[in-house]
Swiss-Prot record:
Domain of life, source organism: Bacteria
Subunit structure: Heterodimer composed of CysD, the smaller subunit, and CysN.
Region (G5): 205-207
Boundaries of every tr-type G domain copy: 24-228
Annotated pathway: Sulfur metabolism; hydrogen sulfide biosynthesis; sulfite from sulfate: step 1/3
This protein's name: Sulfate adenylyltransferase subunit 1
Functional summary from the UniProt entry: With CysD forms the ATP sulfurylase (ATPS) that catalyzes the adenylation of sulfate producing adenosine 5'-phosphosulfate (APS) and diphosphate, the first enzymatic step in sulfur assimilation pathway. APS synthesis involves the formation of a high-energy phosphoric-sulfuric acid anhydride bond driven by GTP hydrolysis by CysN coupled to ATP hydrolysis by CysD.
Annotated stretches, region: G3: 112-115
Similarity comment text for this entry: Belongs to the TRAFAC class translation factor GTPase superfamily. Classic translation factor GTPase family. CysN/NodQ subfamily.
EC class name: transferase
Length: 476
């Protein structure tokens, strides 16, 4: 048991501690930045200084530091997070590592993401579930290409809170001038980011602990909050509750003939008993009769809660449908523009069918056209015939059916989708809806999706057969 938990148990007792812990708000955040900026060391320092490390963990870190550590005689706190053998041997992060801790004010889930460019897809995976990004910058190197890359991806994935931590200030003699130079450079870059982004920039030393949990004695010129104070005070719950009500149905709950409810997690907004709702895509309406949870019925539920809704009327709703407030403005379309992060070696090419999963709904979609690929080092755009591994671009999609969706910046759950290869069943990309386009009326076809897919494979691997493109024939 760590010392922080021991102190709280002594003060509150077991029941009091569990009750307090249950009602704490949760912040999911990630650490990102260029390789060797100190992301894993920062997480280790947060855990250590907030007294969240068990004695056996600390003893193991001391032992491992003598073998693979990089901090001399001191314990290498990065080893608390870098768990893979390859990570420890190379001194880098490869996989996304998750860590959990809590203070008296809040619970935290940390995603430690890799800095190397070839692991950008891992970083995007970590960012997709987070509310805040801690972006580390080495005070000696300043803003690097990978710093811009991770800032852009975090912004693209809808994160509205950034904490830019200028790390390794101890290696530049805690220079205020150097900090101000980096601050100005990042602020100039951040003007190109989308939407309103809350950016706070602080000087830290993860190795020494300056401005991480306690204010630094070496940087008296800095008068702002510590990193932990920022993490404990940022408000992300109210932002989700302020959005329009969205409830993707994950499961139709019918344990007996007398009960029929629709289970899922509220993506945004608030719902109350008696609210008039509409189910999409059917457009049928009813009234919320009950909000059922494991702990009993609620009169009101907000974003983030897993609930079962029962309705006053028997209307047809199935998995993948979306429940919204009656009269809500929701796009229903099979044609859209979406930013895509590509995550596999085989590039994304227009004309190929993929399985699409969006908010519990599964359908088939294809890229009709790649509008442009982003140069994520300077945020410029250039034309592209295909998207390579780790490439990010704006693509025009058509789906086999109309789906209720939002822009990703408005609601991530109903505006984000994953792209699955239909032959291997491997997730090959992630999409973020940026715009709903005019619905496409598809021509009737004598060719099945399988036949079109087979035709595409034959044309790719056996070009000497001179097979005709069936999808082009359908357009004539």
């Amino acid at each position: 048991m760590n010392s922080a938990v021991q102190a709280q148990l002594a003060e509150l007792g077991i029941e009091g501690y569990l009750n307090q812990h249950q009602h704490k708000s949760l912040l999911r955040f990630l650490t990102c930045g260029s390789v060797d900026d100190g992301k894993s060391t920062l997480i280790g320092r947060l855990l250590h200084d907030s007294k969240q490390i068990y004695e056996d963990q600390l003893a193991a870190v001391h032992n491992d530091s003598q073998r693979v550590g990089t901090t001399g005689s001191r314990p290498d706190l990065a080893l608390l997070v870098d768990g893979l053998q390859a990570e420890r041997e190379q001194g880098i992060t490869i996989d996304v590592a998750y860590r959990y801790f809590s203070t008296q004010k809040r619970k935290f889930i940390i995603a430690d993401t890799p800095g190397h460019e070839q692991y950008t897809r891992n970083m995007a995976t970590g960012a997709s579930t987070c509310d805040l990004a801690v972006i580390l910058i080495d005070a000696r190197k300043g803003v690097l290409d990978q710093t811009r890359r991770h800032s852009f991806i975090s912004n693209l994935l809808g994160l509205k809170h950034f904490v830019v931590a200028v790390n390794k200030m101890d290696l530049v003699e805690f220079s205020q001038q150097r900090f101000e130079e980096i601050k100005a450079e990042y602020q100039a870059f951040s003007k190109n980011l989308r939407g309103e982004t809350d950016i706070q920039i602080i000087p830290i030393s993860a190795l020494e602990g300056d401005n991480v949990v306690e204010l630094s004695q070496q940087m008296a010129w800095y008068q702002g909050p510590t990193l932990l104070e920022i993490l404990e005070s940022v408000d992300v719950v109210k932002e989700k509750e302020a959005g329009e009500f969205r409830f993707p149905v994950q499961y139709v709950n019918r344990p007996n003939l007398d009960f029929r409810g629709f289970a899922g997690t509220i993506s945004s907004g608030v719902v109350k008993v008696g609210d008039r709702i509409t189910a999409l895509p059917s457009g049928k309406s009813s009234t919320v009769a009950r909000i059922v949870t494991f702990d009993g019925d609620l009169e009101q539920a907000q974003a983030g809660l897993a609930v079962t809704l029962t309705l006053a009327d028997e209307i047809d709703i199935s998995r993948g449908d979306l429940i919204v407030h009656h009269g809500a403005n929701v796009e229903l379309t099979n044609h859209l523009a979406a930013d895509v992060v590509w995550m596999t070696e085989q590039p994304l090419q227009p004309g190929r069918d993929y399985d699409i999963k969006i908010a519990g709904k599964k359908t088939i979609g294809r890229v009709e056209h790649i509008h442009h690929q982003y140069d994520i080092n300077n945020l410029s755009k250039h034309s592209a015939a295909e998207l390579p591994l780790n490439g990010i671009g704006l693509c025009e999609w058509t789906f086999n059916e109309s789906i209720a969706l939002d822009n990703y910046q408005d609601c991530a759950d109903t505006g984000g989708f994953i792209i699955i290869d239909r032959l291997t069943n491997v997730t090959v990309g992630a999409g973020m809806v940026s715009e709903s386009l005019t619905e496409v009326t598809k021509a009737s076809s004598d060719f099945s999706a399988f036949e079109l897919e087979l035709n595409a494979l034959i044309r790719k691997h056996f070009p000497h057969w001179d097979a005709k493109d069936l999808s082009e024939l359908l357009k004539k």
